[in-house]
């Protein structure tokens, strides 16, 4: 049981760093700041459900994607590690997402899906990670991790106002840098594991 909890904690911290919902708070609040609290919570719920469904879908069909494209898990780990390393370096610089939203032609429901849920939170890095998790870890633990991330996304976005009040943009940048450090170390390890597997080292 202790080993299961340890694995869950490691996977959760890694996926939380990649999705970085705290870093998405300023953009989320910029879109919903004019809404009543209950409406903000509705949008946060739509974002979290979309994140959950997206990550679960790719986690469950990932092995067929590998087969279809004739890609090995090790090759995918190397490519994914490079992608995550780049993301981690951007986060280490304290860069907040530069996703732009044109509010004139879209509804809040559409914004909740694109770009807030995809690709801001459940982007290529998160999708790559859950697919690799499923090949290397116990599927029930991976699924539990994804569900926990979905719940975390909702709680953080629904509390966006309080988070900005407590942390401010500087605090959010510091948090983003911390997540970037975790992500960069994960990426390097992913690349090392991929190289070892590919060359039988």
From Swiss-Prot:
What GO cellular-component annotations does this UniProt entry give? Answer: plasma membrane
Q: Which InterPro entries does the record cross-reference, listed alphabetically?
A: Multi_antbiot-R_MarC (IPR002771)
Q: Does the keyword Repressor apply?
A: no
Swiss-Prot/TrEMBL keywords: Cell membrane, Membrane, Transmembrane, Transmembrane helix
| Chief location | membrane
Segments passing through the bilayer: 8-28, 49-69, 73-93, 111-131, 140-160, 181-201
How does the protein associate with the membrane? Answer: Multi-pass membrane protein
Family indicated by similarity: Belongs to the UPF0056 (MarC) family.
Protein name, per record: UPF0056 membrane protein PYRAB13050
Originating species: Pyrococcus abyssi (strain GE5 / Orsay)
Cellular location(s): Cell membrane
């Amino acid at each position: 049981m202790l080993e299961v909890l340890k694995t869950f904690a490691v996977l959760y911290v890694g996926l939380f760093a990649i999705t970085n919902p705290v870093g998405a708070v300023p953009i989320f609040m910029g879109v919903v700041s004019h809404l009543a609290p209950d409406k903000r919570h509705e949008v946060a719920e739509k974002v979290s459900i979309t994140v959950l469904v997206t990550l679960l879908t790719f986690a469950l069909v990932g092995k067929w994607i590998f087969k279809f494209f004739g890609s090995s898990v090790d090759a995918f780990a190397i490519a994914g590690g490079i992608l995550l390393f780049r993301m981690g370096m951007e986060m280490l610089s304290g860069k907040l997402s530069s996703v732009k939203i044109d509010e004139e032609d879209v509804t809040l429901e559409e914004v909740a899906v694109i770009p807030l849920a995809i690709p801001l939170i459940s982007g290529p890095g998160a999708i790559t990670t859950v697919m690799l998790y499923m090949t290397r870890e116990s599927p029930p633990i991976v699924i539990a991790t994804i569900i926990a991330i979905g719940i975390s996304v909702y709680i953080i976005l629904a509390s966006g106002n309080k988070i900005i009040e407590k942390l401010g943009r500087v605090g959010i940048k510091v948090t983003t840098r911390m997540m970037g450090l975790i992500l960069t170390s994960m990426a390097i390890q992913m690349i090392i594991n991929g190289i070892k597997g590919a060359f039988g080292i």
